[in-house]
């Protein structure tokens, strides 16, 4: 498969030390490799979430780790969006290139709305100190969000990119995993809408289906891939501090 399109992945992290490795392994081992992966540590206070995030960032040059004060899930996702929008200016005190290390950056922006403390990137991403000092956000074609207590099938990105041609959003279904509790009957949103795999949905069609089936609520965050240019032009961000953000 042609892998010229770059996918930006945003993964908020908050006290998920039990699940984070499974999540990140599912990302690292995707069959689609052209990925730029932003981990946003939202002020985790457990013992290992931040250290696990640093471990993966050190090993894989596709990762960048942003450590910020706790602000909620929406704020963490918005940091990822703004990173890919190239809204952040980075500076580093690093004066010497050190192999196999994490390079630390700070924000040079006058405004730091989301209270970002540090940014980390593997030295594997750079050839020399000049490249480190000129670090900026990569350009992406598509963006997708993943919660850090979830994980993907290993061909998830490949299957999404295959379907992104000519559309703004690819919406996919999901499965629930029940651990140590009785499995409940559960219908996903896609099952309520009863859209079949591969269906092209126009906005009017989607609204009509919601009316027909008396579906009065809908959410979308991690259930699909979005054309980043579409998201940027719409200037869409997640709303902070709301229920089920």
Would you name each region that the model predicts?
Residues 1-245:
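Nucleotide-sugar donor-binding/catalytic module of glycosyltransferases
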